[in-house]
Amino acid sequence: VGSEMCIRDRLEAVAVSCGPGSYTGLRIGVSMAKGLCYGRGAKLIAVPTLELLAVPVLLGEHPAEEDALIVPMLDARRMEVYAQVFDRALREVRPIQADIVDAETYKEYLDRGAVYFFGNGAAKCMEVINHPNAHLVKNIEPLAKNMAPLAEKRFVEGKFEDVAYFVPFYLKDFVAKMPKKLI
């Protein structure tokens, strides 16, 4: 408990995955982070989920050529994914989009060279992306431990969010549905 108190007393910032992702998960995570920041007077750092997902590839934990493009993907149900295209330095090549994946979705990038797809939306996409430059990297999930380098960079750069007004990035509007089984 003593070491926990020391850490709490020195808390300068809280990092949170800001989306896209599960509506409920984002709301809970961001609410918890905002509460900690408000209560401790700490800064809020928002880390986009797709950047967080790319960290293992950037750190070389999974192989990818230096000139390759990387495409982190989150499953958005059916054949839709939330995806963003980066170079190996995590510079944005194409902004985040909700893609309905077919053989043509990433063709312009695949025709130029190697493209590495990963995340929980990637496996289903590989069924329709039939290209020799398409590579699936398995077993990459957005982990809190991978947030540290991205959060530290934002901390050093002074990229903080307004605790009172920050909201998660959902990408798509929430659509409420009636449950299939009524009680």
Show which residues each predicted segment covers.
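DPxDG-like acidic metal-binding loop motif
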Residues: A15-T49
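Catalytic-loop motifs flanking and including active-site residues across diverse enzymes
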Residues: I28-M32, D102, L143-M147
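Surface "functional belts" at beta-alpha junctions
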Residues: K43-P142, Y170, V175-A176
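Acyltransferase
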Residues: V137-I183
